């Protein structure tokens, strides 16, 4: 308890945790406030009850009709960023493997976009939720992932869970214990990580919600890990989504969080017996120790987007590009890690060019987040020599 109090006071002193969160305006918002207090057992029960309610009998949505609806709502905005998929299969591959698609995306919490993040080159009109939600949904519907991993989700219960569940996804959400969204007036509740998978492609074997630790201290960052069984092959694999601590000066903290996540995943996957895909905004460029820790892990992980480079060893030049009051920020922070002994990357979605992004960077009228989505097509590796 003393260690927890010390950690909380440290966050208060550093300005990350406010001693006062904004009051909630209605019963739904008050429920979000309760969910943020994950140290309370009653709040944890409330979240579980809410997630259980996702199995309702609502009519399924047609993804094409919903995409059309999004595009009608966005007809006055510039066209979305054009991006192409690049095949990563070797020339010698004769058979077309059955693939599954994974999407990783920090969608930008609405409260942060309109409040704390200070995107000085992005008009406030471009950040309004009434239209921005259609841009986010359009991106998801265009790429139709089988597994979707999101960070900074603060509209889970009123937008993503009800819509995506009707599209056939099973949905899981874990809020940050002390979300910075709660410090923003008129917020929609805490942000957190969410994991969605299509139930006609996978079945849930088990699910773990993880509050990441830095050595012995519980932190404000979380992860979800779910072991799924492929409906077609019967093979199992584990998907994890996370969002590590942001900002310069917290490199050792991120390393501790990443190490804790790897320890948890090693236990869940029984020492990589079950193949693993980890999606996340790591808030760390490839020179950071937490990146090197994942790259050298005993779980035998590789970063999927390195395969787009000419040498197969270099990360993209950026996955986020924004302009704030503190200046321009262009970094690679987002990754899809995978078990390279058991899985193969068949294709990856390319990143837009600087010219496409434009001089005002992200977010913008034609892209809803300051982070770019990452999308990969995977297949199970059938080469027995690589499964050892």
UniProtKB/Swiss-Prot annotation:
Substrate binds at residues 152, 176-178, 220, 243-246, 281-283, 371. Its cofactor is Mg(2+). One of its GO terms (cellular component) is nucleus. GO terms for biological process: circadian rhythm; NADP metabolic process. Keywords: Biological rhythms, Cytoplasm, Hydrolase, Magnesium, Metal-binding, Mitochondrion, Nucleus, Repressor, Transit peptide. Its EC number is 3.1.3.-. It is found in: Cytoplasm; Nucleus; Cytoplasm, Perinuclear region; Mitochondrion. Mg(2+) binds at residue 152. InterPro entries: CCR4/nocturin_mRNA_transcr, Deadenylase_nocturnin, Endo/exonu/phosph_ase_sf, Endo/exonuclease/phosphatase. Expressed only in the photoreceptors of the retina. Expression is controlled by the retinal circadian clock. GO terms for molecular function: 3'-5'-RNA exonuclease activity; metal ion binding; NADP phosphatase activity; NADPH phosphatase activity; poly(A)-specific ribonuclease activity. It is an enzyme of class 3 (hydrolase). Binds 2 magnesium ions, but the ions are only loosely bound to the protein. It catalyses: NADP(+) + H2O = phosphate + NAD(+); NADPH + H2O = phosphate + NADH. Pfam families: Exo_endo_phos. Signal peptide: none annotated. Phosphatase which catalyzes the conversion of NADP(+) to NAD(+) and of NADPH to NADH. Shows a small preference for NADPH over NADP(+). Component of the circadian clock or downstream effector of clock function. Exhibits a high amplitude circadian rhythm with maximal levels in early evening. In constant darkness or constant light, the amplitude of the rhythm decreases. Belongs to the CCR4/nocturin family. This is Nocturnin. It comes from Xenopus laevis (African clawed frog).
């Amino acid at each position: 308890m003393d260690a927890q109090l010390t950690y909380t006071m440290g966050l208060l002193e550093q300005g990350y945790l406010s001693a006062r969160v904004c009051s909630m305006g209605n019963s739904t918002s008050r429920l979000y406030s309760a969910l943020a207090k994950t140290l309370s057992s009653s709040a944890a029960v409330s979240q579980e009850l809410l997630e259980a309610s996702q199995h309702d009998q609502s009519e399924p949505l047609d993804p094409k009709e919903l995409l059309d609806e999004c595009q009608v709502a966005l007809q006055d905005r510039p066209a979305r960023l054009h991006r192409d998929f690049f095949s990563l299969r070797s020339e010698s591959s004769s058979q077309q493997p059955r693939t599954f698609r994974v999407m990783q995306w920090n969608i930008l919490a609405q409260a942060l976009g309109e409040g704390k993040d200070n995107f000085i080159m992005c008009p406030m009109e471009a950040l309004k939720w009434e239209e921005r939600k259609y841009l986010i949904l359009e991106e998801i519907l265009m790429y139709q992932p089988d597994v979707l991993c999101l960070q900074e989700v603060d509209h889970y219960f009123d937008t993503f869970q009800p819509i995506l569940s009707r599209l056939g996804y099973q949905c899981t959400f874990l809020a940050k214990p002390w979300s910075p969204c709660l410090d923003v007036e008129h917020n929609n509740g805490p942000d957190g990580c969410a994991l969605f998978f299509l139930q006609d492609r996978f079945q849930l074997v088990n699910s773990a919600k993880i509050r990441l630790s830095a050595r012995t201290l519980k932190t404000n960052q979380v992860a979800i890990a779910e072991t799924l069984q492929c409906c077609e092959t019967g093979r199992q694999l584990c998907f994890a989504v996370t969002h590590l601590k942001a900002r310069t000066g917290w490199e050792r903290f991120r390393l501790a969080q990443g190490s804790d996540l790897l320890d948890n995943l090693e236990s869940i996957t029984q020492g990589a017996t079950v193949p693993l895909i980890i999606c996340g905004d790591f808030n760390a460029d490839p020179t950071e120790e937490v990146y090197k820790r994942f790259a050298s892990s005993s779980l035998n992980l590789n970063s999927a987007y390195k395969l787009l480079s000419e040498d197969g060893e270099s990360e993209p030049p950026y996955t986020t590009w924004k302009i704030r009051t503190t200046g321009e920020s262009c970094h690679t922070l987002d990754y899809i890690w995978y078990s390279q002994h058991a899985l193969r990357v068949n294709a990856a979605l390319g990143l837009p060019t600087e010219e496409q992004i434009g001089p005002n960077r992200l977010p913008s009228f034609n892209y809803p987040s300051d982070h770019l989505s990452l999308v990969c097509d995977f297949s199970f590796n059938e080469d027995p020599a690589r499964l050892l």
